[in-house]
Structure formats: structure tokens, C-alpha cells
């Protein structure tokens, strides 16, 4: 696991597994009242155990958790902060309600396959659905929320305006090509990329759901590559970007072909 500060108020934690990212955002108001949100989660137990330590060492106090979408690897913050409320997009709230226990089952399958032991079963606890597009207050300002579906049927991206940071969920990854899940959609994915474009153009840092934080120039290059790839589907020769042309990504490409051709 790696933790890097991309701004005085923003720390990004990157898991050793799938390079899944977790973003910690802090904001203090002039009256001294401060708030802190943890967005998404790392994957491995020792990484989750370290999250409260990272927050404490920064001198911050957790206000709540947020998730970009309802895939299980983004919902593990409850292990680190068992009493914190979890905020999500209304689409994610609907997904979780419609598929109770899905995240827990998929986590259990992952743990069994990879010999991972956890202290207890995953409990999502209190989940608050947020209107998206919209905003959520933090300190004396707000985080911006943007719909981000296409990878899955649900999701949101978040912007930290004063820090110039965009947390985009499973989009614009330097290590993963666009992945259309069973509930995903090429058209919705392309629409999300276009919604993200103006945010990325104004950003200092973009935090993808998987991979290291990247600057705006690289994020825009990835966006162009991803648009070209998606628009070429279902052509089997759709251009997988050279930097992401690995065996694992070719498997994702094969899944995408089946989804788009169905």
C-alpha cells in the first residue's frame, strides 16, 4: 500500500491489490469546525487497518465515508470505520437495495480464492443515498457530485474544487481499459467520459479507481484513448492502448466484445 498527499487536504491511498484507490479529503472552516470524508477503500485487511492511523496522523477526524459506486472493492471502509455512515449516489443506493448481500458474496469469493482472512463479515450499515448531480457539504464548502455510470449501472464522480482534485471512480485508469460490467453500457460509459472532460481539463490531479493519481494532461490522453477504444467496439481489433496492453486487459477486452455484441 502507498499513501501520497496530492494536496494539503487530500491524501490518496493505493492498495497493493488491483491498485484500488481510497481518497481522504479534509476541509476546515474559518470557525475551526473541520470535516473529513474517506472515499472508496483499499482491499487488503492490513491496509484497511491502517486507514484510521493515516487519518489520525494527519490530525483529522472522520465525518463519514463515500463510495464512487457499488462494486465490493470500493465498499470496504466499514472495516476501518465501523460506526461511520456511508454516502453514495442514488443509483448506487438503488443497486445495493436491489441486490442485498451481493457485495458480501463477491468479497467472500475473492477472499476464498486469494486466501485472505478478515476479522468479520462485511456489514454496510447505514447507507445514505445522495442526489446526483449535486453537492455534499464539507467544512465551509462543498464537494461536487457528477453521475458516473457505464462501467456499472450506478456511480458518481466527485470533485474537490479548492484542491483541483477529481475522484472519478473506475474511469480514466492508467492500468485498466474501460470495463463494461454485466450492468454496464458503452453508450453510458462514453457519456460519462464526456461529462468528466471539463472537470479533467480544470483539474490538477485525477484519482482513478485503479492506478496512481495522474495529472490533467495524462488523464485527457487516457480519455481520448478510451473514447477511441469504446467507439471502435465491437471490432475485435479495437485499439487497446499500448501502456495497458497486458494479458489481464485482453481478457477484459474479450468480455467487452461479448457485452457489446450481445
Give the location of each predicted region.
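Conserved beta-strand hairpin/beta-sheet module of binuclear metal-dependent hydrolase folds
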Residues: 2-57, 158-169
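Short Pro/Gly-enriched beta-strand edge/turn motifs at strand-loop
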Residues: 4-10, 114-118, 138-142
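Short Gly/Pro-enriched turn/cap motifs at secondary-structure boundaries
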Residues: 13-15, 127, 147-149
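Conserved N-terminal glycine/acidic-rich loop preference
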Residues: 23-24, 38-39, 48, 62, ...
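Short loop/turn motifs at secondary-structure junctions
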Residues: 33, 61, 201-202
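Metallo-beta-lactamase
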Residues: 37, 41-45, 144-149, 153-222
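Active-site HxH/HxHxD metal-binding segment of metal-dependent hydrolases
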Residues: 48-49, 53-136, 228-232
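Accessory terminal helices/loops
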Residues: 197-205, 212-262
Amino acid at each position: 500500500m502507498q499513501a501520497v498527499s496530492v494536496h494539503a487536504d487530500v491524501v490518496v491511498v493505493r492498495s497493493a491489490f488491483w491498485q484500488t484507490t481510497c481518497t481522504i479529503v479534509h476541509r476546515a472552516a474559518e470557525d475551526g469546525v473541520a470535516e473529513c470524508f474517506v472515499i472508496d477503500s483499499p482491499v487488503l485487511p492490513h491496509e484497511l487497518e491502517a486507514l484510521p492511523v493515516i487519518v489520525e496522523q494527519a490530525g483529522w477526524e472522520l465525518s463519514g465515508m463515500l463510495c464512487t459506486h457499488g462494486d465490493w472493492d470500493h465498499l470496504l471502509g466499514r472495516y476501518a470505520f465501523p460506526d461511520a455512515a456511508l454516502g453514495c449516489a442514488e443509483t448506487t443506493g438503488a443497486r445495493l437495495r436491489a441486490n442485498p448481500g451481493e457485495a458480501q458474496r463477491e468479497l467472500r469469493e475473492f477472499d476464498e480464492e486469494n486466501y485472505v482472512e478478515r476479522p468479520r463479515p462485511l456489514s454496510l450499515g447505514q447507507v445514505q443515498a445522495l442526489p446526483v448531480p449535486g453537492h455534499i457539504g464539507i467544512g465551509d464548502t462543498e464537494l461536487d457530485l457528477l453521475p458516473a455510470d457505464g462501467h456499472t449501472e450506478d456511480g458518481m464522480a466527485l470533485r474537490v474544487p479548492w484542491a483541483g482534485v477529481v475522484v472519478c471512480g473506475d474511469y480514466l485508469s492508467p492500468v485498466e481499459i474501460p470495463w463494461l460490467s454485466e450492468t454496464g453500457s458503452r453508450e453510458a460509459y462514453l457519456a460519462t467520459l464526456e461529462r468528466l472532460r471539463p472537470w479533467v481539463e480544470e483539474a490538477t490531479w485525477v484519482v482513478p479507481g485503479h492506478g496512481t493519481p495522474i495529472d490533467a494532461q495524462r488523464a485527457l490522453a487516457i480519455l481520448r484513448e478510451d473514447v477511441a477504444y469504446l467507439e471502435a467496439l465491437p471490432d475485435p481489433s479495437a485499439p487497446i492502448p499500448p501502456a495497458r496492453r497486458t494479458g489481464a486487459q485482453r481478457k477484459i477486452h474479450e468480455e467487452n466484445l461479448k457485452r457489446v455484441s450481445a
